[in-house]
Amino acid sequence: MKIKQFLFAFAMILLVIGVNSCKKNDETVKEEFENTFQISADQAVTNNLSQDAEDVFLEIAQDYSIAGNFAPEPVNNIIPCATVTITPATGFPKTILIDFGTSCVHRGVTRSGKINITLTDSVRKSGSIAIMTFTNYFVNMYKVEGTYTWTNTSTANTRSWIRLTAGGRITAPDARVWTHEGNRTVTQTAGVGTISVLDDVFSVFPGTHTVTNSSNISRTCTILEALQRKVDCSNIDKGKVKVQGPNHYATVDFGDGTCDNLATLSIDGRAPRTIVLR
């Protein structure tokens, strides 16, 4: 009888340990899922902000006739609320300062602060390098920091760049902070033969990025389907990114080409959630 009682008690102990272990494991999995969800949403915002910085750079380069490929045109102040200073007036390398002041609203996007760029040669010339940094720079209340380096890899038939991000840091309007670094290949797919930048369309593929939150939890992000960014749209409107978790993954879907500020996020094929890009 004592042996039976002992075995029963021992079995109950194992059952309790097993239940508690499962509960802790479920809580851990749930926490990891939430970390992946938030980091995935953050990387989607990061993609948009990085592409936005590139759009501003290319618009200014075209407006001030330092893009190359076309004869010089009169300055049109394409971003009228920004003050642009380029030195020296002739020759390369050049230093470009884009000052948005305290509030510059252009095509529905509010910017403030400064973008600093050093440029080795005409933007569209193969081999040219542009290095961008930021001074107290905000886009729709997101603070953008880090160093972005563009290296022109264009050929006779293709206009493209490799974009490297080092020391990237984003502070959201709710004070959350995350860092990011990685590289992307950007190819222009429309508007190559026109002076206007408004018909330009860019495809971002391939590329990998690492995003780390304030708790030092990281996720690796890989482009599955090319991200599409039209200059006349404020957000990426097409493409997919895979975000790898410890034992799961998330897929961020930017849509079918419709211009809006939404994307969907699904973890391990579960029902997707909608996220706001910025």
Regions found by a protein language model. Name each.
Residues I17-S21:
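C-terminal motif of bacterial Sec signal peptides marking the signal peptidase cleavage site
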Residues K24-R278:
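Low-complexity, intrinsically disordered segments exposed to solvent
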Residues M1-F8:
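Bacterial N-terminal signal peptides that target proteins for export
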